[in-house]
Amino acid sequence: MPTPPPQPRPLLLASGSSYRRELLRKLGLHFTAVAPDIDEAARPGEAADDLALRLACEKALALAPAYPDHLIIGSDQVAVLGDSRLGKPGTHEKAVAQLLRASGNTVTFLTGLCVHDAVSGVSHTGLDRCHVHFRRLDRDQIERYVTADEPYDCAGAFKSEGLGIALIERFEGEDPNALVGLPLIQLTEILKRFGIAVF
């Protein structure tokens, strides 16, 4: 495997998510991952895309004082069905309920991205929008899926990188990685602005 170009700056992934760590490893870059401690509650009247972007930036900015030499990557995902947000279900019962609502419908996954330069204070952001069209699913199918994949920590109770891919008819979006939680296409473009190239 070719050696990647030297990294001029240390990278920090502001996330405790194993899914995001696996995605970032795809780029072959050296990085550290630390989970930030922020309040992820939505503000009154806050739009879903604004929430995803704000939380991505807050995650990155929260770690800047402790990592003053780093480029810090923050990302957050919000799932929307109609006018309702689908959060991380947390329990089996809530996961089943979310997927019963998603059955036969389209869920939009909004993934916010922020890369913050702790040295200069400059941030670049992006937002990926992916529409996922779910198959018509009965309760037994959903129960079996939730038991097998345990998507309790995933927005919309859905793991596209796991068995969840069998729940959908199709998806419309620019970057399938964003569905997992980190839009790599936008990330590589933003990193180039900071002088970090994958190739």
Swiss-Prot record:
GO-annotated biological processes: nucleotide metabolic process
Cofactors: a divalent metal cation
Keywords attached to this entry: Cytoplasm, Hydrolase, Nucleotide metabolism
Family matches, as InterPro entries: ITPase-like_fam (IPR029001), Maf-like (IPR003697)
Name of the top EC class for this enzyme: hydrolase
Annotated site (Important for substrate specificity): 19, 77, 161
EC number: 3.6.1.-
Pfam families cross-referenced by the UniProt entry: Maf (PF02545)
Catalytic activity: N(7)-methyl-GTP + H2O = N(7)-methyl-GMP + diphosphate + H(+)
Superkingdom in the source lineage: Bacteria
Major localization listed first in the record, in broad terms: cytoplasm
Catalytic site: 76 (proton acceptor)
Residue ranges of coiled coil: none
Listed GO MF terms: nucleoside triphosphate diphosphatase activity
A GO CC annotation given for this chain: cytoplasm
PANTHER family assigned to the protein according to its UniProt record, in alphabetical order: 7-METHYL-GTP PYROPHOSPHATASE, BIFUNCTIONAL DTTP/UTP PYROPHOSPHATASE/METHYLTRANSFERASE PROTEIN-RELATED
Role, per record: Nucleoside triphosphate pyrophosphatase that hydrolyzes 7-methyl-GTP (m(7)GTP). May have a dual role in cell division arrest and in preventing the incorporation of modified nucleotides into cellular nucleic acids.
NCBIfam families listed in its UniProt record: maf
Protein known as: 7-methyl-GTP pyrophosphatase
Lineage: Bacteria, Pseudomonadati, Pseudomonadota, Gammaproteobacteria, Methylococcales
